[in-house]
């Protein structure tokens, strides 16, 4: 009897969490949509807003946690590609639910030359359909959005592979220059 009760409770919790998570995916902006705005602190405590990137391409990548294996690889690949990305007229911002102190340590440890934005409550990740919300724990899904010079979503990369994400973005930007 207790086993069935526990199974029922567990099933209910799983369904509830699935429903909560499904809501954030419904917010996913598509190519051509205006990029959802944001006002977030970076690793240096400076407030960053979407509008400051008008006139350049913006690679906005969401990642689960600072200093975890996939996130380190993805960040280092963006770091190593900064010259090519800047030549293509692009800036890079990483966003996770970590605080700006964690971001500062992460950026310092790996010499990251771009902004890491602290989305502590996951609000911005939610507006980009990129939040995993399990109630007691939240983290960003590994999605990347390429925002054009006019502030519109140009390309969406979902569930990206950290080892390939940067190459896909660079290749896309090169096709625009050709």
Locations of regions flagged by a protein language model:
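Chalcogenol-based redox active-site neighborhoods
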Residues: 2-178
């Amino acid at each position: 009897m207790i086993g069935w009760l526990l199974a029922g409770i567990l099933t209910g919790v799983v369904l509830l969490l699935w429903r909560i998570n499904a809501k954030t995916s419904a917010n996913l902006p598509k190519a051509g949509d205006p990029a959802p705005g944001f006002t977030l602190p970076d690793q240096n405590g400076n407030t960053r807003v979407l509008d400051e990137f008008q006139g350049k391409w913006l690679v906005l990548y969401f990642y689960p946690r600072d200093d975890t294996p996939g996130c380190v690889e993805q960040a280092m690949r963006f770091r190593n590609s900064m010259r090519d990305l800047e030549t293509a007229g692009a800036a890079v911002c990483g966003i996770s639910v970590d605080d700006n102190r964690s971001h500062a340590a992460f950026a310092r440890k790996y010499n990251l030359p771009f902004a890491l934005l602290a989305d502590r409550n996951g609000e911005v990740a939610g507006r980009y359909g990129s939040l995993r919300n399990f109630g007691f724990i939240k983290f960003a899904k590994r999605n990347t959005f390429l925002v054009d010079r006019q502030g519109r979503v140009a390309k969406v990369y979902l569930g990206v592979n950290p080892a390939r994400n940067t190459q896909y973005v660079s290749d896309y930007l090169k096709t625009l220059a050709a």
